[in-house]
Amino acid sequence: MIEKWKGRTIQSRADAAELLLDMIRPLKPYYSKGNAWLHAGDSGVHYGEKSSRMEGFARVLWGLGPLWSQESPALSKELKEEAEEWKQRYLSGIIHGTDPSHEEYWGDLVDYDQKMVEMAALAVAVSLSPKTLWEPLNTEQKKRFFCWMNQINDHGVHPNNWRFFRILVNTMFRMIGCPWSKERMEEDRAVIEGCYEGDGWYHDGNKGQLDYYIPFAI
């Protein structure tokens, strides 16, 4: 499948959007009924199957969030309709994944939970595309989304690039008008600054273990 994408020319936003939709289209059959989980295949993870399926759901947002952040007038009618279909799928997934009464609830967090990593994709997507992923929610759905995401402020987070995941969540809260933790933001920024090694490089919690996530988040 990868072969057909090699050598593809990307010269415009529409080209990038078309490639993204082409890449994620094969995933559609693997979403759960409530769209909160994506089970693309069985593989070994140390953090449990539920978190793995939530990870699958969230990682696609690194592409969809930027896609929805603005209009793509040069896209064909069919691709615009497909982008809209993805919007509805992800709204449904967020609503069900953050609802404790739903069978596809993503679950409560514990200290150093893998789901904290996936919160970054959700936070960035909502920050870039609030009209798609935040404003359509009703009051109760917004409350549940906030409560689920806010769990990251109440649990231990590894003293490495994971702190930027919490920074991104609190930044999102500020942007959409939700309560946010200034204390956590300051604490996490101090940890990130403590990872700086010079010349633009940060380490991932251990001296000399250079990191690529932090500059990406910046």
Regions found by a protein language model. Give the residues of each.
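Intrinsically disordered or highly flexible coil/loop and linker segments, enriched in small
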Residues: 33-36, 73, 158
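Low-complexity, Ser/Thr/Pro/Gly-enriched N-terminal "stalk/linker" regions
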Residues: 1-55, 88-93
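HEAT-repeat alpha-solenoid elements in large eukaryotic scaffold proteins
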Residues: 61-74
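Generic, low-specificity signal for short hydrophobic/alpha-helical stretches with a mild N-terminal bias
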Residues: 2-9, 42, 76, 104, ...
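Aromatic-lined, polymer-binding surfaces characteristic
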Residues: 53, 64-67, 83-218
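Short coil/linker segments at helix-helix boundaries
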Residues: 76-82
